[in-house]
Structure formats: structure tokens, C-alpha cells
């Protein structure tokens, strides 16, 4: 293993912009941008968030060096949530990335496992919990759709351990073939999305790319139940970067956009951050090219028109959701030190609303602007509006700042949505103001009461664990999706919620947060205000299936399963390349209630190798088509049309 694989920020080929070199609140934009607006006082929040970290502090599971100025590197401690023992209940795993070179030398990263005790309303250590020896963990989530959580780590050669029974398989590499992986440094982030619209979740991997030749953004397409294939040909990358996070979503103009959320060690003035999808290639795979959807007059540029690029301000995380319920994704990007906010538009570019939002930066006790890292949109107070939560902390450059520029301890900022895409700082009212250096966010519903609880990971100290005890008379629900024809986590689905029939609907997006170092299974929180039930819920699945449910009770979690409209047999989608073997395609058109639509018209088409053995035939469960394998290796893409409208997923078949 190369010594540079786990080199930290101080090893960069070029210095990152310091807070003074980055855009500052007092030199951004015309003066009228920073005129404060009248913000209604926040509601009484009751206890706010309750800190549950004491058991971890008493347990002291790790030896953590004390924080000090001019640190060469820092310990990262990340809270992760998932079922590590196969009992159907989630555990909390604290993953420790030490400052020493033990990880570089191939030693496994330490961890500690806890469980939330609902009776005691506190976390307790899980005695005897054992995980495979792996590098620092990035996530505990179901990667292959078999219902069992898997492990994914921040190092390519031992990245994946598949959940099996009450344990895990031996760690395996992401993909053994890419030649440029050895020239890339450590993995910094993962993002899950169906990049090629085949109904399977793929991996977008961000790596520390400060030593060319290397690639900063890796697209790994799923090619089987537990296999991924890197496709470097899908992205045209003109300038490599050091992304702290990777992101993917389909925005209102209809294009899927990938983000390499970072700056370039080579030239931060020219590094692209955004890539949009274009026409697919002859084999049906997507292609992505760099572009800039930011408006020329963006907050982060100050008075300069169209320059610098957003990469100059060191992007570190991103989140997207529909803040104004207009059916378009809005986007926030963590910059140094700006909380950059864009409103989604029908056509590029975005609209910059950073100043109007009211919280372009937040100051530490030193008076200097803090550095934002992870961020998320979530309805913390269940008032039906999406709030904004942002973790702030040092990067390596900030640790070595001279005393007159040192930011000092920072904190997690909580910003209440007061309407009109405006936000008010309610950090102290929610009791989230503990000082430290924070980088990662983990949202979870520890107690299954329908609101978002919080874990914050940082540097040189244990994560902070918080239970949402906001008491303002409002109610909410947590919604988790399980896709069948769509990807199994429902990433990319849109939810429309009617609290009352005929009322104004709320819109929520599934899978809109990208963090450094950690990846989580997505879920959605919906605040209902004073209502105790959802009158109607509409799920627009990535497959194109539209499902409706009614009368969902508040103050609990619900799991919504997609009625399957397309089933491939065998589920591996692989068959021998012998000219005889067949794959079966079952199409079941659904009405919004999930029932079979017997009056539908179904057509199945095939592109690539293999042969479609006649039109789809009607049966009791729907329409069935047979695809006969080609006599030689190859692939084919299935397109299904229902009443002339193509499903949005196109499964790929493999002949081996």
C-alpha cells in the first residue's frame, strides 16, 4: 500500500484557501444583500435536543489525543447506524480513524458498538460485538437489497463486507480492475444512486486526488447481486479535484447531475464541481460532462461576475430537497465559510438565495466565521417546513492558523425555516451549542417517535448523540422506502404529502444528503403541525410507478414498499451465453392503490444482444416476455412501455 493512501490535508500539493482567502461575509455582494430581515421569534421548543453522550464518555472506548494547535492530522470519529448483528434492530457504531499511521500499515480501525435502550432512554454498550477487521467504516447499510445490512469502508482493497446471517463476509475490494486506483489517495466519501437507471443502486466514490494521474470521481455500476464495475468512460473530467463528498440527483431541467464536492489541489480556479448527463452511448450507458449551473452573480463570488468557480471556496458537503414545495430540488453547498443556497429552477442556472435566506455564515465565539462541513435539510420541529442543520469544524489548514486568525471551537448550527426560504438561528434554543470541531451528521429516529434525532461526528473527541425532545405540540412521521422495480432504497423518489384532503401539499425528496466520510440509508421526516395523521401520501418512485396511501398515523415510523411493476427472473439478471438460456420479464401495470391494471397495454423491447422471443403474453399476474441469451458474451437493455409510456428503469441483462 502506498504511504500516501492515508495522507491528510496537510499533504496537499497546494494550500487550501484559508478563511481569510475565502469569501467573507463583510466583502460579499452589494450592501443590501446583508440587510437583516425581521424574523418571527422561534416557538417554544421545550427541552429541545437532549444530549445522550454521557454513557460513551464514561465508557471511554478509545484513546484519543487531546486537540492542539498546529496539528499535522486529526482523529476522525464518526457515528454510524445499522443492524450489525442481524436481529432487526439498529445499533450505533462509532468508527475511529486515528491520527497515527496504523491504518496506513494495514491495521484495522477501532470501533465501538452501542444500542439505544428504549426503557432507559439511553445508549448502552453492546458487549462482545464483533465486526470484520476493516479500515475506517463509512456506512452500515443494505447495499445489495437482500434485507441485511452490509459494511462499506474508506479503503478500496477492503471496502465491502456483505451481511450474512448474524455476521459478515470477509472484506472484499470495490473493484479489482481499475489501474488508476493506486494513484488515488484515500476514499473520502460514497454516494448511492441508480446512475444508469437500471433499477439497481450504484456507487459514486470520491477520492483524494492530489497526485496526478488519478481520478477524483469514480462511477461504479452494479453488475450483479454483489459486484460493481468501475466505468471511468462515463465521466469526462477536465481537471481533477479533492472532493470531500460525492452527490447525485436529478434536477428540474430533467438532467441527472453529479457533483465532485471539493476543490482542486492543482488549480482551484478551474476545477469543475458539477457534471450533467447527456445522451447515452450506443450500449445505453449514461455520459456526463462538466458544466457550471451557478449564476454569474452568486453570493460566494462577492462582487466578481462569473469568477471564481465554486471550487475555489472549498466545497465540503451538499444537500438537496424542496424547500418551497414547488416540485423542484433546491441545493445547499457547504463552502468555506459560506452556507451557499440555490433555488431550483426550470432551466439552468440555479437562482442564488443565500443572502435572502439570512444565514450566509455563522460566527464562532472568536467572532470569526466557522467552517461548514456536513449539512442536511430536515424538519426538526415538525412544523411542516424543512429546517437546515450544519456541522462546523476545522479543516487541517485552520488548525495551523496563527492566533489572530484561529477560529477556535465551533458548533453545530440549527436554522429554523420561517417561510419564504428564510432561516433563523435556533441553535441555543435547541441546546445544540456544544463547542468542538464537528464534521459529520447522522440522522436517525432512535426512539421511533416520528422525529429526527441526531449524532454528530468530529475531531479529537467522541461523537455527540442527541435525542429530539422538542415539545411544541406538533406531530410528525418518519418514512422509509423499499423499492422493488426501483432501486431498493428508493433513492430519487418524490413524496407528496397531503396533511388534509384539499390542503396545500408538501413535497419531499429521498436521498438528498452527501457528507464527507459517511454514507447512510435515506429516510424522510415529515412534520404535520397539529395534525395527527397524513390524509394522503403519494410516492413517485424512480421507476415511474405512482403509489398512493391514505390515513397514516403520526408519531411513528412507516416503511413504504413499492408494488412491483417489473420483475426479472433470475434476479441476478445473468444467464449463460449459449443461445438457449432465457430470462423472464414479468410486467404488472399498477393503479395508484397497487392493484393490477387488467386494461393496460404492455410492450417489451430489447436493445443489445440476445433475442426477444415474441411479444409479451398476458397471464394472471401480468404480462410475461422471454429473452433468449445470445450465443456469445454481451448485454441487453430491456425497455417496457405501459400504454405507450416507457418505465423510467431499463434493466440490463448479462450473457456470460
Predicted feature residues:
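Short, conserved, GDST-rich strand-edge loop motifs in beta-rich repeat architectures
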Residues: 96-108, 208-214, 262-270, 391-409
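Acidic/hydrophobic-patterned starts of short beta strands in beta-sheet-rich repeat architectures
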Residues: 86-96, 145-154, 197-206, 253-262, ...
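Ser/Thr-rich, Pro/Gly/Ala-heavy low-complexity intrinsically disordered linkers and tails
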Residues: 7-44, 59
Amino acid at each position: 500500500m502506498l504511504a500516501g493512501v492515508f495522507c491528510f490535508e496537510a499533504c496537499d500539493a497546494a494550500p487550501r484557501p484559508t478563511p481569510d482567502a475565502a469569501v467573507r461575509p463583510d466583502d460579499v455582494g452589494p450592501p443590501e444583500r446583508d440587510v437583516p430581515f425581521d424574523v418571527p421569534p422561534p416557538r417554544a421548543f421545550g427541552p429541545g435536543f437532549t444530549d445522550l453522550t454521557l454513557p460513551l464518555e464514561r465508557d471511554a472506548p478509545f484513546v484519543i489525543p487531546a486537540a492542539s494547535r498546529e496539528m499535522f492530522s486529526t482523529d476522525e470519529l464518526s457515528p454510524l447506524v445499522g443492524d450489525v448483528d442481524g436481529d432487526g434492530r439498529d445499533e450505533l457504531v462509532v468508527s475511529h480513524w486515528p491520527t497515527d499511521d496504523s491504518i496506513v500499515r494495514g491495521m484495522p480501525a477501532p470501533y465501538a458498538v452501542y444500542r439505544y435502550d428504549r426503557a432507559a432512554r439511553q445508549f448502552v454498550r453492546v458487549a462482545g460485538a464483533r465486526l470484520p477487521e476493516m479500515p475506517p467504516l463509512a456506512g452500515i447499510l443494505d447495499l445489495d437489497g437482500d434485507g441485511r445490512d452490509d459494511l462499506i469502508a474508506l479503503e478500496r482493497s477492503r471496502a465491502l463486507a456483505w451481511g450474512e446471517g448474524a455476521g459478515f463476509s470477509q472484506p472484499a475490494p470495490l473493484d479489482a480492475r481499475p489501474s488508476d486506483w493506486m494513484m488515488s489517495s484515500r476514499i473520502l466519501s460514497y454516494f448511492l444512486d441508480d446512475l444508469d437507471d437500471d433499477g439497481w443502486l450504484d456507487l459514486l466514490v470520491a477520492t483524494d486526488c492530489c497526485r496526478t494521474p488519478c481520478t477524483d470521481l469514480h462511477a461504479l455500476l452494479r453488475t450483479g447481486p454483489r459486484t460493481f464495475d468501475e466505468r471511468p468512460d462515463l465521466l469526462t473530467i477536465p481537471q481533477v479535484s479533492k472532493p470531500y463528498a460525492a452527490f447525485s440527483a436529478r434536477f428540474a431541467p430533467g438532467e441527472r447531475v453529479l457533483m465532485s464536492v471539493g476543490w482542486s489541489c492543482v488549480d482551484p480556479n478551474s476545477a469543475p464541481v458539477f457534471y450533467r448527463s447527456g445522451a447515452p452511448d450506443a450500449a445505453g450507458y449514461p455520459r456526463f460532462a462538466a458544466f457550471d449551473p451557478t449564476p454569474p452573480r452568486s453570493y460566494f463570488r462577492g462582487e466578481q461576475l462569473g469568477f471564481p468557480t465554486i471550487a475555489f471556496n472549498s466545497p465540503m458537503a451538499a444537500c438537496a430537497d424542496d424547500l418551497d414545495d414547488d416540485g423542484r430540488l433546491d441545493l445547499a453547498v457547504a463552502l468555506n465559510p459560506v452556507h451557499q443556497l440555490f433555488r431550483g429552477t426550470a432551466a439552468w442556472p440555479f437562482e442564488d438565495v443565500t443572502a435572502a435566506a439570512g444565514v450566509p455564515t455563522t460566527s464562532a465565539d472568536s467572532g470569526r466565521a466557522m467552517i461548514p462541513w456536513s449539512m442536511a435539510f430536515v424538519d426538526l420541529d415538525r412544523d411542516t417546513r424543512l429546517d437546515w442543520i450544519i456541522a462546523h469544524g476545522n479543516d487541517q489548514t485552520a488548525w495551523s492558523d496563527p492566533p489572530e486568525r484561529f477560529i477556535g471551537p465551533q458548533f453545530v448550527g440549527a436554522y429554523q425555516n420561517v417561510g419564504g426560504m428564510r432561516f433563523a438561528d435556533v441553535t441555543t434554543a435547541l441546546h445544540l451549542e456544544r463547542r468542538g470541531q464537528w464534521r459529520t451528521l447522522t440522522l436517525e429516529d432512535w426512539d421511533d417517535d416520528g422525529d429526527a434525532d441526531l449524532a454528530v461526528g468530529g475531531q479529537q473527541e467522541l461523537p455527540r448523540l442527541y435525542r429530539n425532545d422538542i415539545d411544541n405540540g406538533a406531530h410528525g412521521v418518519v418514512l422509509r422506502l423499499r423499492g422493488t422495480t426501483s432501486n431498493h432504497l428508493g433513492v430519487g423518489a418524490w413524496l407528496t404529502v397531503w396533511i388534509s384532503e384539499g390542503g396545500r401539499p408538501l413535497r419531499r425528496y429521498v436521498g438528498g444528503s452527501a457528507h464527507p466520510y459517511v454514507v447512510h440509508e435515506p429516510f424522510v421526516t415529515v412534520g404535520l403541525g397539529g395534525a395527527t395523521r397524513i390524509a394522503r401520501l403519494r410516492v413517485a418512485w424512480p421507476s415511474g410507478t405512482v403509489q398512493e396511501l391514505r390515513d397514516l398515523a403520526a408519531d411513528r415510523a412507516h416503511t413504504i414498499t413499492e408494488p412491483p411493476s417489473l420483475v426479472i427472473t433470475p434476479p441476478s439478471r445473468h444467464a449463460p451465453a449459449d443461445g438457449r438460456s432465457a430470462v423472464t420479464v414479468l410486467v404488472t401495470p399498477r393503479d395508484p392503490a397497487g392493484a393490477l391494471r387488467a386494461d393496460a397495454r404492455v410492450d417489451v423491447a430489447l436493445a443489445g444482444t440476445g433475442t426477444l422471443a415474441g411479444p409479451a403474453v398476458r397471464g394472471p399476474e401480468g404480462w410475461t416476455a422471454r429473452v433468449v441469451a445470445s450465443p456469445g458474451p454481451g448485454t441487453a437493455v430491456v425497455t417496457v412501455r405501459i400504454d405507450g409510456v416507457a418505465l423510467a428503469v431499463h434493466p440490463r441483462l448479462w450473457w456470460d
